[in-house]
């Protein structure tokens, strides 16, 4: 019996939701909330409705469970990419890689007032976002089109049901999907003076999103950090040590 399993990664773009955290006060206590997560919950009904329409158009009378991965994953991706769930992709495996970037600008040292003091002034900014399906395997109910020449991105609608629940079973079974987003750095400044003093400042930020499909739970962790470095270069410096 043919089967298929593996993992899937693709460069992505989630910058629209990167700075959306808000605060809410309940009984005098301030909590941080996530507009993207609230949107994810709203998207579930939208995606469920779109899938029902697609199933009806295909002549399939059965329905997905509300927390089926075929509903949750598109709702999750639409929320954290800032797309409208009404017209967002319904695929579980995004098809097109989105370019990430790194920008380095070294022109400030040529400006009047700076070029007499600094030999170099560099600004840096980098962005990286990766969508991961940590592990997938085909449902044992499906044996057709499991060969490698069938693209994962051509994700089909479910057509077979679970004998116990009566709900549609997805063609591929996923345990978890995640998004790793990094600003490395969000802003970085590196300078060197004419007197060989050097300094650098970097503000980095990252976010890790995970959707656990066994319990429909979303976890989000964020980290940020600031680094400073200073240095001085001196030619022909004599150290007071004997060798």
Model feature map: region roles:
Residues 1-243:
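Exposed, low-structure sequence patches enriched in small/polar residues
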